[in-house]
Each structure stands twice: as C-alpha cells, then as structure tokens.
Amino acid sequence: MVLTLPFMVAVQEISARIGRVTGAGIAGTLRAHAPRPLLLAIVALLVVANVVNLGADIGGMAEVARLLAGGPAWVWAGGFALFCAVVEVWVAYRRYVLYLKYLTLALLAYVALLFVIHVAWLRVLVAVLVPHVALNRAALTMLVAVLGTTISPYLFVWQAAEEIEDMQISADPRPLRERADGGAEIARIDADTWGGMGYSNLVSLAIIIGTAATLHAHGVTDIATPAQAAQALAPIAGRFAELIFALGVLGTGLLAVPVLAGSTAYALSETMGWREGLERKAGDARGFYATIALATLLGAGIVISPIDPMRALVWAAVINGAVAGPVIAAMVVLGSLRSVMGDYVLPPWLRWFGWGGAALMVAATVGMLVL
C-alpha cells in the first residue's frame, strides 16, 4: 500500500484537475474526446461494479446492525438504503459534503483497532517495505482486487465531479481554463489529494494489518460477511475489538454508499447528456437522482439474493482494477492536451506517475489472465 501511494495521489489529482480545469467530469470529457463505444463499455462496467459494491456495503452494514441490535438483516438493509438515498437526493450539496467529511472520522475505528490487539510491528514493517507477491493467478487476482479498491474508476468520477460541484458554488464558478489566476486552486487540489490519499492509505493499512494480526494469524480465512469478521475477533482480541470493527463497518458503509451511488449517477448522466449535480433540486436533475435511487435499490436487492456478498465484492474490485488501467491512460492523454486543459496541462511528474499507475494496473490484470 505504501508503494502505491504516489500512483494513488497522481491518479486522483489528474481526475481533480480535469474536473476543475475543464468544468466537465471524467465521463463528460471522454464523451467529448474519446470513441463512444469505449465510453459506453467503461461506464457499463463501472455501473455493474458499483451496484455490486453497493450490495456488499449495504449488506455488511445490515449484518453488523443485526449483530449489535438484533432484528432481520433485510430490514436493516432496506433502512440503510432508504436513509442513504433520501439524504443524498434531498440534502443540498454544500451541506451534504460536510456530512461526508465528518463521516470519514469513522474510519479511524480501524486505526484504533491496532491499539487493542497484539501486532508484531517489526514483521509488519518488513512486509510493508518489501512486499511479497506470489506469481500465480490467485495471488494476482487478489492484487488486482486490492488495487481496484484504491485506484478505482468510481473514485476518479467522484473526484472530478466534486471539484465541479465546489466550483459551481464558489465565488468564481468559471472553469480554470477560462481564468489566468488558477495557481492557488491547483495548489489546494495538490494539498487536498496528498492529505486525502495519505489518510486513505493509513486506513487501508490498518485494516490489512488488523485482520492479518488477528483473523489470519488464527486461521480464520473463510469470511462470508463483515459481521462474521467482527464476531470472529471477539474470542481472539476481545469484545471491545469486535465493537470497534463493527462500528468501522457501519461508518465505512454510510460513507461508501453515497459515493458509489453518486459516481454511478455522475458517470451515466455525463454519458447521456443529462443534467447532474447534488446541488440541483431533484426536479431539475431527474435522471441523475433517479439513477442514485435505482443504484441504491439494486444494491439493497443483492442482500436478499443468493449472491455471496463477499465474493461479489472481490470480483467487483477485480472489475474496477481491470478497467482502471485504460481509464487512467485516457485521462493522462486528455490531461496532456492543451486543447483540453489550456494553460493547465499536467506537469511532467503527474504524467509519469499517471502512466506508471496505468502500467501497474494493466500489468497486474494481464498477469491475472495469462498465468
């Protein structure tokens, strides 16, 4: 995870710059400059992966709520889905974004878990700095899945879209390519991206270390739901660790569901030419908000289907990882064109790490397919 941080930062910053400089999202920019069949294929895979992710997240929250408070999981799933959809549709962006920012603090539950369990920190340090990856299909599939959760197309779409939302409610709502004083905005994007991706990487490492030091170390490797993971922690690390993990699942789900549904709506709306934006009223962006509601509903439906949510989550991450490489390459090309970015074309370091990130994702995907 530490070694992928520069690629994560580069890709998210490229996404943010495209949105803020052009005033168009990732799908909207691809629609204007890329072949339509490529755009439709990318968006179709994004929608499928997002809906499966929504189902896994809603199902995870429901199972944890059942563990903590009792009651049928499907009732909790419906309640969480309804709450997330209603809040995202009816709360204005400028207020809603504050809710999401404060909710990221819930992710610290996974970091707190490390302080209540035993961790062999020397072994962790060696493994982090010198990671070992077995060159077989199973290992490379998991590598693509892990990369697909951190360098993921839905995050590209969301990052660019939120830059546009912020721009439209700012004192000067013009895209940067129409302004000559964009240096401060670029610096702000740079600082925000490094801070956000650093925080994301910290939480991801905490989850990996925490589960490896407890569940995997005690032979618990077949987990069907996050609630089972929380329950399995109790006899190993105590009830407090179980509670912390459970609260982390709830907080993560409440943060992830709106982002997944929102990125689905942004991508589809930009592709179809619909009005979009969380600052718009529901009646002014019907297709956009209908997509949010439908994606969340379909995700909740997975909870009562025979689909194994954890396996589905892994394969959704694999899809994200496989799609990410071509999308990153397209973003680097577009971000390097003066006809698209004006005076704000990507600097060399972003292009280098952008191409490096694309190569990493493609190489892992090809290795997964051919070995």
Named regions from a protein language model:
Residues 41-44, 68-90, 106-115, 284-298, ...:
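Transmembrane alpha-helical segments of multi-pass small-molecule transport proteins
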Residues 1-33, 42-52:
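Juxtamembrane transmembrane-helix boundary signature
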Residues 17, 21-22, 39-70, 74-82, ...:
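Hydrophobic transmembrane alpha-helices that form the core helical bundles
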Residues 121-127, 134-142, 320, 329-333, ...:
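A generic transmembrane alpha-helix motif of multi-pass inner-membrane proteins
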Residues 79-80, 88-118, 319-324, 346-351, ...:
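Membrane-interface loop-to-helix entry segments
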Residues 7-21, 161-169, 198-228:
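Extracellular/periplasmic helix-exit of transmembrane alpha-helices
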Residues 105-132, 149-165, 330-339, 365-371:
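Hydrophobic alpha-helical segments and their helix-loop junctions in multi-pass secondary transporters
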Residues 36-37, 73-78, 240, 254, ...:
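Loop-to-transmembrane helix boundary motifs in multi-pass membrane proteins
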